């Protein structure tokens, strides 16, 4: 389908820079530049799609990386489509899997979907967001439609997927229905006539299937934009609830603030790039100040306040900061302390104390806990069987012994 060419103006270049910010890949960039130019010339906004399967009831900051990008493009005046994969969730996305993902029931999907959009609306502008469910067009397909859709893609192309190839070579079963998932996700783009589809880096294959199917159905092909997977608070693994290194967007303000303050200084700049709404120029200026001798803690506080304010309120962010500072002030916690990495998360507090060099023996660790002399992130430990999940913690024994403990799996 041909469209008139429009000039690539400085405004288009600026829009393109916003799209590229923090992204892993933008394919095909020259095509997307032409789409942006045409949109500016005609005043017709682009249709930008993000599909999420409601596989869990809560969203964490890792999910908001791609939502933030949607909001940036939404603020440029484009139409964003928040697609809830209520049909594809019954299949289960095989992306990155070493085994077949168990499908969800309709009841589980409906329960999870209720909170998904409400939480996503904390990032997206609800008044300018189109909500769709892919059961609208997938349910009516029926057996005939499904076979016709399957005829549009080859097994050889499907086996180009790294996870399918790995499982096939390793003798791990691949169910036929798993081939249908990327086809149906791609068909979503056909149904919605998407100009751009967003997703995580693990979704690249599925997004490319959407491009191919649009071509098969005589549509202009969508471009795809993939965003990196956010590293969790442990600084090692991608943010995940199962890894215990996540920050939920519905967490209490003080908890959210404290977790953000626990990340390393190096990881902080990655969080700025992927989570902050501040301009790149502002972030670069702040980084220059830190490099020039300003305390990195100031930048971390600003980041934590911005994110808490977004998901709660500016007042909640101020209160969380005050509570955090009071906890550190009352405990006289130093900003500089030894950093120790401890493996085997989740891990018991007694072993953590020994591994961090804060006590000489297990009995000393137990005695300090029983006497109320151990604190984690400023909170007194009262249970000697306390288990800590992966993450970074300030651990204190007595008044003078401190360590920043990075607990990894």
From Swiss-Prot:
Pfam families assigned to the protein according to its UniProt record, in alphabetical order: SYY_C-terminal (PF22421), tRNA-synt_1b (PF00579)
UniProt catalytic activity: tRNA(Tyr) + L-tyrosine + ATP = L-tyrosyl-tRNA(Tyr) + AMP + diphosphate + H(+)
First-level EC class: ligase
GO CC field: cytosol
Keywords: Aminoacyl-tRNA synthetase, ATP-binding, Cytoplasm, Ligase, Nucleotide-binding, Protein biosynthesis, RNA-binding
Transmembrane segments: none
Protein's UniProt keywords contain Ligase: yes
BP GO terms, sorted: tyrosyl-tRNA aminoacylation
Binding site for ATP: 241
Motif, 'KMSKS' region: chain positions: 238-242
GO MF annotation list: ATP binding; RNA binding; tyrosine-tRNA ligase activity
Subcellular location: Cytoplasm
Residue ranges annotated for the S4 RNA-binding domain, each copy included: 347-407
Presence of keyword Protein biosynthesis: yes
Role description: Catalyzes the attachment of tyrosine to tRNA(Tyr) in a two-step reaction: tyrosine is first activated by ATP to form Tyr-AMP and then transferred to the acceptor end of tRNA(Tyr).
HAMAP family hit by this protein: Tyr_tRNA_synth_type2 (MF_02007)
Quaternary assembly: Homodimer.
Protein name as it appears in the record: Tyrosine--tRNA ligase
């Amino acid at each position: 389908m041909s469209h008139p060419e429009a000039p690539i103006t400085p405004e288009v270049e600026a829009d393109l820079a916003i799209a590229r910010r923090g992204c892993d890949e933008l394919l095909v960039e020259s095509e997307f530049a032409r789409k942006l130019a045409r949109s500016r010339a005609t005043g017709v906004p682009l249709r930008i799609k993000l599909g999420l399967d409601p596989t869990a009831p809560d969203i964490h900051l890792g999910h908001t990386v791609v939502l933030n990008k949607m909001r940036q493009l939404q603020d440029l005046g484009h139409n964003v489509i928040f697609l809830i994969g209520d049909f594809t969730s019954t299949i289960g996305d095989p992306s990155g899997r070493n085994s077949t993902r168990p499908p969800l029931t309709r009841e589980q999907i409906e329960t999870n979907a209720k909170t998904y959009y409400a939480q996503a609306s904390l990032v997206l502008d609800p008044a300018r967001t189109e909500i769709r469910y892919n059961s609208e067009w997938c349910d009516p397909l029926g057996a005939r439609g499904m076979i016709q859709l399957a005829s549009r893609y080859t097994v050889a192309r499907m086996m180009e997927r790294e996870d399918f190839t790995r499982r096939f070579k390793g003798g791990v079963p691949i169910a036929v229905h798993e081939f249908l998932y990327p086809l149906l996700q791609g068909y979503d783009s056909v149904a919605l006539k998407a100009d751009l589809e967003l997703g995580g880096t693990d979704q690249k294959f599925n997004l490319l299937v959407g491009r191919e199917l649009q071509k098969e159905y005589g549509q202009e092909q969508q471009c795809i934009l993939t965003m990196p997977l956010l590293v969790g608070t442990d600084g090692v693994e991608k943010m995940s609830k199962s890894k215990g290194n996540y920050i939920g967007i519905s967490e209490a303000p003080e908890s959210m603030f404290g977790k953000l303050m626990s990340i390393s200084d190096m990881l902080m700049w990655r969080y700025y790039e992927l989570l902050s709404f501040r301009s790149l120029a502002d972030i670069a200026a702040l980084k220059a100040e830190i490099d020039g001798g300003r305390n990195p803690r100031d930048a971390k506080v600003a980041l934590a306040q911005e994110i808490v304010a977004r998901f709660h309120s500016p007042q909640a962010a101020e209160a969380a900061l005050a509570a955090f500072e009071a906890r550190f002030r009352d405990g006289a916690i130093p900003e500089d302390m030894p950093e120790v990495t401890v493996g085997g998360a989740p891990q018991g507090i007694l072993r953590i104390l020994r591994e961090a060099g804060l006590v000489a023996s297990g009995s000393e660790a137990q005695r300090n806990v029983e006497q109320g002399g151990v604190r984690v992130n400023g909170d007194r430990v009262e249970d000697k069987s306390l288990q800590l999940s992966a993450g970074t913690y300030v651990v204190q024994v007595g008044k003078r012994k401190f360590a920043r403990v990075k607990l990894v799996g």
